[in-house]
Amino acid sequence: NYLYYSKHLHIILAFPNTWYSNLKPKGQFNNLDSVTKEIRLMMDPNADPYAAAPEVDPNEVPEKFGASDIFDLNQVQLLNAYSCTECGRCTAVCPANITGKKLSPRKIMMDTRDRIEEVGKNINKNGKFVDDGKKLLDDHIQREELWACTTCNACVEACPVLIDPLSIIVEMRRFLVMEQSSAPSELNVMMANVENNAAPWAYNQADRLNWAKE
């Protein structure tokens, strides 16, 4: 039956994909528990700065931030890739794509599906996954595509079965920033300014109203 191995598989998967879609307000990020815990500790005026750190199992694998391959994506994100009918509505409304940038939300989903297929064939051949030296990041989805996204959610709004390419883009960006400290220079400057001046602009808070005196 052609249905099960063609793009028309989405006819079967559209319902569960819609059922498991994210009901949170669009654009709301998922907070990382470990990071939230550290920030609360830093901002707690009653916290003891000299308190001993909690014991950590030396054999425990450190938590990975974000996603660099399909193994880091959740089941709904993987289901999204197979629910896509490649209609292109998402790319048609993407402001980054319209202005000539490299990003195509449709391609993000196709690349994710291609990587899943690649990993599946690897597992079928070897009985388990054997490192093939490839990742979803860089080998399929380029960094230029990720940083072209404005996170406007137009692609999510346009999809008839509520596929969310933005969630994959955000997770891969999170990996780049938090695991590799890799971000466009403009973003690094902005984050440094927020850290130093509590604002994205490169001047002191005391100088904010100087423009009004001129």
Question: What does each model-found stretch correspond to?
Answer:
Residues D72-A81, K107, I116-E214:
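Iron-sulfur-cluster electron-transfer modules
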Residues S6-A14, R106, L166, V170:
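Short helix-terminus and kink motifs of transmembrane alpha helices
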Residues F15-Y20, S34-V35, I108-T112, R173, ...:
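A glycine-rich phosphate-binding loop feature that marks nucleotide/adenosyl-phosphate handling sites
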Residues Y4, Y20, K24, P95, ...:
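Hydrophobic/aromatic-lined pockets within catalytic cores
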Residues N1-P54, A67:
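Membrane-embedded alpha-helical bundles of multi-pass integral membrane proteins
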Residues Y5-L13, C87-G88, C149, N153:
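P-loop NTPase catalytic cores that bind/hydrolyze ATP
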